[in-house]
Amino acid sequence: IRCFITPDITSKDCPNGHVCYTKTWCDGFCSSRGKRVDLGCAATCPTVRTGVDIQCCSTDDCDPFPTRKRP
């Protein structure tokens, strides 16, 4: 499987059986810059914590950098 990986946001090969993930959360600059984003691959979908959104998928390049709606 190929997943986008941060910080470069490039598509890279991940080991067999892994899933791609997109993790987003707010930090102190969330209101002006939007949510922080972490893209990668893992053996299993990371555990969700309070205030953190995680989406996992299992097809090539299924975790693109999320777009932010402009006002």
Curated annotation (Swiss-Prot):
Disulfide bonds join 3-20, 14-41, 26-30, 45-56, 57-62. The keyword Acetylation does not apply. Pfam families: Toxin_cobra-type. GO terms for cellular component: extracellular region. Gene3D superfamilies: CD59 (2.10.60.10). One of its GO terms (molecular function) is toxin activity. CDD domains: TFP_snake_toxin. Keywords: Acetylcholine receptor inhibiting toxin, Disulfide bond, Ion channel impairing toxin, Neurotoxin, Postsynaptic neurotoxin, Secreted, Toxin. Expressed by the venom gland. Coiled coil: none annotated. It is found in: Secreted. InterPro entries: Snake_3FTx, Snake_toxin-like_sf, Snake_toxin_con_site, Toxin_cobra-type. Belongs to the three-finger toxin family. Long-chain subfamily. Type II alpha-neurotoxin sub-subfamily. Binds with high affinity to muscular (alpha-1/CHRNA1) and neuronal (alpha-7/CHRNA7) nicotinic acetylcholine receptor (nAChR) and inhibits acetylcholine from binding to the receptor, thereby impairing neuromuscular and neuronal transmission. This is Long neurotoxin 2. It comes from Naja naja (Indian cobra).
